[in-house]
């Protein structure tokens, strides 16, 4: 099985996947690092770092996506995987539900019980777009479930591929590779034109033939499905390739460091630091080029250089095991402790309702004080009134915390521990954790870790 890898995790993933799969279309830097020549062949699956650098997307044949996804899911306890209901190239019948400044929100129906929406830019559709309009659309750029963006859509059909992309009704290229392709014993379906990638410049005629044949088969599958589609409700018509998303947690990023370290000098927290901010990428490369880093993750240096520090505002990004991410609000960093590798964040609360599981009324002006320790599996939030009276403590059990420059990230593991104003300590939401395991959203090893942490916290409180 052939796998293509791109993005900041490429070196580590090439080392990890190379023992089980054939790596193809490797970039020049990867070939230099591995001191190897990788074939330019058709990829059964492509693994690409997500735009926010928090994880990776997989696209390709259903079998390949499933196999590679299984391999990467085993990377660490805090790696999460979800099937993409709207992978690149998928065709939907959609209905416009809202018009925005640069495009329209499109209802794409449901896939496997999950509602799907997309975003259709106005420059990708002819004529005026209004609510209630219906279009046949294709996913041009998929988006991970933990982000805020919707999959980007287009009305023109294309068949994605690593070496060649088929475009409906466009003109052919004039490159040397395009001229070489005229010698191939296979032609694209009528009305489709091949657009060859730069990687194809180094491909053999056999590889080009295989790529064009696969793309042509996908094009025929798409057109047959489009012709046969008879629907007036939003929904997916066809998906010529499968997709999946993986969210890496802190433990998984450090495990990826170990794979990269087998090939290249790698500082502790290499991937964790690069995932936090693009500004750190050059600094990490510079540090690794100067010396052989060792020891622990340099929390003090990283947070001092890139943030957060006292006075900064950070968002609490509360990830859910089903893939969503919810913001618990922003707060001010009131303390940064380099030795404890922690920050303390304060938020002023609005009035109304009660504190979850604590049961105490929430008043306007209450202060929530939260301490986040890098790498810890839990964090406490102490709620106090404006005059300092303690209302309760809520301890969230989660995947290892990552303190990024403008946000604290983790995935919530449902079970929590609370302490009321009277000192009563309770463990809550075990049933939600059990349900998440039953649904396949949380692995049993991860759930067991969450239960162990919750038990220890309850005993300590």
UniProtKB/Swiss-Prot annotation:
InterPro entries: DUF402, FomD-like_sf, Ntdp-like, RNA-bd_FAU-1, S1_domain. Residues 89-158 form the S1 motif domain. PROSITE patterns: S1. Keywords: Endonuclease, Hydrolase, Nuclease, RNA-binding, rRNA processing. GO terms for molecular function: mRNA 3'-UTR AU-rich region binding; RNA endonuclease activity, producing 5'-phosphomonoesters. GO terms for biological process: rRNA processing. Its EC number is 3.1.26.-. It comes from the Archaea. The keyword Hydrolase applies. Transmembrane segments: none annotated. Probable RNase involved in rRNA stability through maturation and/or degradation of precursor rRNAs. Binds to RNA in loop regions with AU-rich sequences. Belongs to the FAU-1 family. This is Probable ribonuclease FAU-1. It comes from Natronomonas pharaonis (strain ATCC 35678 / DSM 2160 / CIP 103997 / JCM 8858 / NBRC 14720 / NCIMB 2260 / Gabara) (Halobacterium pharaonis).
